[in-house]
Amino acid sequence: MKKSKIICVLACFFAVTFLLFSCGETEKIAPVDIADLSLSELEGYVAVAKYKDVSIALGEKSKEEAISDYLTANSKLNKLPEDAVEYYGAQLKEEYKYHAKQSGRDYDELLHELGLDEEALLKEARTLVYKDIIFAIIQKKESICITDEEKKNFFDRYVTKYAELYGYSEEYVRANLVDEVYQTMLYDKTMEYLIINNDVK
């Protein structure tokens, strides 16, 4: 898998959420769910930029990319929860190990081919935590959530989407990644809200 594709896939999903992947040696690290933090706790970490009634230049980007980049560039980072950074970093490592195994390569070999190292993974983890906090604040302020009906009606569609996005089988996703599927639904619903409430062109 090419570097640009991996980074794009990881970044677009982790702007929202959440937990990434729970497997292997990362079970030693307690899972961290940013959504469990209170609004006041979240706002202690990040001061979110204005996210409604804003004109956002589209350029060559998709609306989703333009909005995500705007929020990332214009929000103010105060600090990050280090337990979340550690957890996300461990999950990223597991993700690359998975792709290395699937392609019959060594983990270190894959990182070298992609021009990455452990420091780069940690930097990416910090970016993902930052983005997740931004989206979690918006979700809490605007009461954006996924209803039981939405989970039921859209589950199959999102299982397919998640499997295609991350290269898993649908059977594996259904058995092991249900929470991640729901988080993808939440991300899409949040992004739809942001697209509707801003002028992106």
Residue spans for each PLM region:
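Peptidyl-prolyl cis-trans isomerase
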Residues: G24-L114, R126-K201
